[in-house]
Structure formats: structure tokens, C-alpha cells
Design a protein with these regions (language model features):
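Terminal alpha-helical segments
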Residues: 1-134
Length: 134
């Protein structure tokens, strides 16, 4: 168990949340909101793995990582959000049609939903691990 490394993951996750707060109302950057949301959730899940002494894989899929921690943390999340995070993760890194939702870039409303989901997961994991991040 490494509470220190778990805390480092969560500090990095908070940086993603703060980045989202700066860009979440810009319609041009909604795909970047999704990217930072995905990064936040990925880091939160890896914090749980670190805290519980499990090997942290070189894996980016929030769905796969959630499968590894869902019995550890009581998270109330919709799997569809994790699917969207995984689908949109590529879009922020590559041009073209890769990583877009079926209807294209996320809307501003969807961007806010991604932020809310990431914030909920971050806060829940912090409480579960008894780690405070300022």
C-alpha cells in the first residue's frame, strides 16, 4: 500500500480538473474537456490501485481500470460516461474522425457532464482513500 503514490496520482488528477475549469465553456475545446476528464478518471482509478497495493498497469481505458477497482470503491457512475471518455480520449491526440462521439464533438452540455462525472469520481476516491488535496 502506498498512500504517498496514491496522493501523487490524485494531485495530478486535480490538475486535470483545474484545466477543465478554464476551458469548459469554450465550444471549440469540448473534446479537450473530455480528454482531461478521461485523464482525471484514469488517474483516480490508478490511485486506488496504488493505495491497495495492486500493480498499476500501462492502461488508459477507464472501463478496464474501473473493472479492476469497482469492488474496492463504492462509485455511483454510469458506464456510458466511461465509454465516452474512452472514445474521446483519442480525439484530443489525433485529427480526423478517430475518437469522436457518434454525433461528432461533444456539446457544451456534454462537456459539463464530463466535468461533473470526473469531479464526482475524484471526490469519491479522495474520501475513500482518506486523502485531502488542497
Amino acid at each position: 500500500m502506498s498512500k504517498e503514490l496514491a496522493q501523487e496520482w490524485l494531485v495530478s488528477a486535480l490538475a486535470d480538473l483545474k484545466s477543465i475549469q478554464y476551458i469548459m465553456n469554450d465550444a471549440f475545446l469540448t473534446h479537450m474537456v473530455a480528454f482531461h476528464g478521461q485523464q482525471c478518471v484514469e488517474k483516480c482509478f490508478k490511485a486506488v490501485l496504488e493505495y491497495t497495493g495492486k500493480r498499476v498497469p500501462k492502461e488508459h481505458s477507464t472501463l478496464k481500470l474501473y473493472g479492476m477497482i469497482k469492488d474496492q470503491v463504492p462509485l455511483d457512475i454510469e458506464i456510458d460516461v466511461l465509454t465516452d471518455f474512452d472514445d474521446l480520449y483519442i480525439d484530443a491526440r489525433y485529427p480526423g474522425e478517430f475518437g469522436l462521439l457518434p454525433d461528432g464533438k461533444p456539446t457544451l452540455g456534454e462537456a459539463h457532464e464530463f466535468f461533473d462525472a470526473a469531479m464526482h469520481i475524484f471526490e469519491t476516491v479522495c474520501v475513500y482513500l482518506d486523502i485531502q488535496i488542497d
